[in-house]
Amino acid sequence: MATLEEEFTLSTGVLGAGPEGFLGVEQTDKADQFLVTDSGRTVVLYKVSDQKPLGSWSVKQGQSITCPAVCNFQTGEYIMVHDHKVLRIWNNDDVNVDKVFKATLSAEVHRIHSVQRTEPLVLFRGGAARGLEALLVEPQQNIESVIPDEEVIVWSEVFMLFKQPVLIFITENHGHYYAYVRLCKSHSLSKYTLLLEKEEKSVKPNFTARVDGKFISLVSLSSDGCIYETLIPIYSSDTEQNQRLVRALMLKSVVSGGVRNGVALTILDQDHIAVLGPPLSASKECLSIWNIKFQTLQTSKELPQGTSGQLWYHGEVLFMLHGKSLTVIPYKCEESSLAGALGKLKHTQESGTHSVPHFVNWETCSGYELGSSGAEQSRTLRRKKVETNLQPEVPGFKQLLSIIKKDSEKHIEVELRKFLAKSTPAFHTIIGDLVAGLVGRCKAEPSFYPRNCLTQLIQTHVLSYSLCPDLMEIALEHTDVQMLQLCLQQFPDIPESTTCACLKLFLSVGDDCLRDSNINMESVFDYSDSTQDEKKEMEEQIEIVQNGFGPEDGNCSEDSQQLNDKPADTAHEPGSFPVTSCPVAPKRAALLNAVLHSAYSEPFLLPHLKDIPAKHVTLFLQYLYFLYLKCTGSATMTLPGVNPPTVSQIMDWICLLLDANFTVLLMIPEAKRLLLILYNFVKSQISIYSELNKIAVSFRELQRLNREKSSRGLYSIEVLELF
């Protein structure tokens, strides 16, 4: 569901809204501050929460601002263009715009677009685009024209796609509309023809857009009162070809058809769209929010004083010119679901109020009575019983949130246990909100850390990293290895940077901290069961490599000789190999096993593995090598225990560590012995697989000969007698 909250107005005493309203409302680098540009000479900086202006700047008499002022998110400065070609840059400390930085450009500017994580982009009327920094280096540089002279830009927008700005602008030429998509980094430009209906050419449609995968979803509000969607490819196979794009109906009859003014729309999220204009049943203008997925009107607000047909949205706030005042309307859009669209979400109802049904009762439609009055009464009683059972859950949830904000850890733990035992909530969002409340208080109060409460919530098995991204960060700050192990076991979507941070902590944390931690030891087997024969066998693996190949077989005699010629006392130094006992304590091994089981993508993990200290990399390699020897010593190639690491996981992590830290490991004497063993082992594996391939080829050849022999005997003909 979507709701429009109570509106409020901003003082517009210094602004002069022309007949077409304001030029624009743009976000600044402060979440609560916005730049409002009128259609004359003034720019005002507003702080919405205080409902008052923080500053205003005006150009000289006779000059006029020709595109909305924007904020450079990289520097915090403000940028505007007056008289089409004059660029001005200033900040909060400047008072007189005439004395701030000025640059006169060689071509007329249509608009400046500024989005976060990149520099502002200047779009010229001829369709060319330049980054602000490149433009300031040479303001009078030649600006090419990429669109025909007859075409006029009527709408434009910039999106960030994989850290690359993507510019889209719509042009109009005698009632025909064209879409241009420019990839700013690759400088590619694609042109598309928008196929609009004939009745639309007399009225300019309103546009808004969003990125949907590899397409830009261009949404237009047409003169017939319907909303249409056109999917525009971001990456075109042929940039020279003028492709024709057909639109599809998205919402039917959302405003009165034939309306010429006071109509606008903007996309709020993937499921909701805000529409400004008179509905079909009323002549007065309204602001309404529609659910795109389920084609339903969620909420609306009447605007009796009329509007300029302009609508801006930033964050969770809508801006519009209502009458002569700049009106701000906060809104909220919940996640779209079928239950929400049909009004079937759980809610409380005050006694004595009558609720209007949100859906049609098909059993009583069209004069048909399919059920008796007794059946209807039983359905009513059953529905009331269900609502009575559901009502205590929401107040209990809200009460628990208030307890989390102010009560002690012990009290929170008791109330949380009661709440989970009573209602057992199955919704991810409820558990996520509880974790967010606890983590938020942990950040505000460093001494507050309810480990038991957080553990209970994680053990509900409904959380993920994306639902509570700050939880593991708090656990890392408190060196809570128990919590981190639980998160690694439960969360399927942990980023590689966080996984590597956990690995660094597990390798560096002190034994005293591990001794006091309650760590799950199911994945660790008993290391004390190793027999003397097993130790002797592993010691002999220095001279005789596994699978029956000695060092001489792999032409590794020099390296192996150096390895075997080490003094006897070297084998007993810390960090020396081969490993005859586990190099880490059992609790540390259990933590490392949790890392081995975590999901990762190799390109994203490797850069973070390079940040691990060399001594910790060596220790981790020792442990992985020890696990590998245990695996190869088993006939099933598996380790004992509940969900232990597999051979493939062990080998993958060995390869990852060597790829990320091989140069560093070469400089460490303790790691040289391991590298030589791995080197010899890989060569022996190559040899054994080569021999196995030869045997396989021989077997295939024998099978072929046997098939030929059997076939020859099957089809032979023997002549017994001739007549």
Swiss-Prot record:
Pfam families per record: Nol11_C (PF20998), NOL11_N (PF08168)
Region (Disordered): 549-572
Species annotation: Mus musculus
Residues with PTM N6-methyllysine: K346
GO CC aspect terms: nucleolus; t-UTP complex
Subunit composition and interactions: Interacts with UTP4. Interacts with FBL/fibrillarin in a transcription-dependent manner. May associate with the proposed t-UTP subcomplex of the SSU processome containing at least UTP4, WDR43, HEATR1, UTP15, WDR75.
Name the record gives this protein: Nucleolar protein 11
Purpose of the protein: Ribosome biogenesis factor. May be required for both optimal rDNA transcription and small subunit (SSU) pre-rRNA processing at sites A', A0, 1 and 2b.
Subcellular location as annotated: Nucleus, Nucleolus
Keywords on record: Activator, Methylation, Nucleus, Ribosome biogenesis, rRNA processing, Transcription, Transcription regulation
GO biological process terms, semicolon-separated: maturation of SSU-rRNA; positive regulation of transcription of nucleolar large rRNA by RNA polymerase I
Keyword Lyase: no
Signal peptide per UniProt: none
Keyword set includes Cell cycle: no
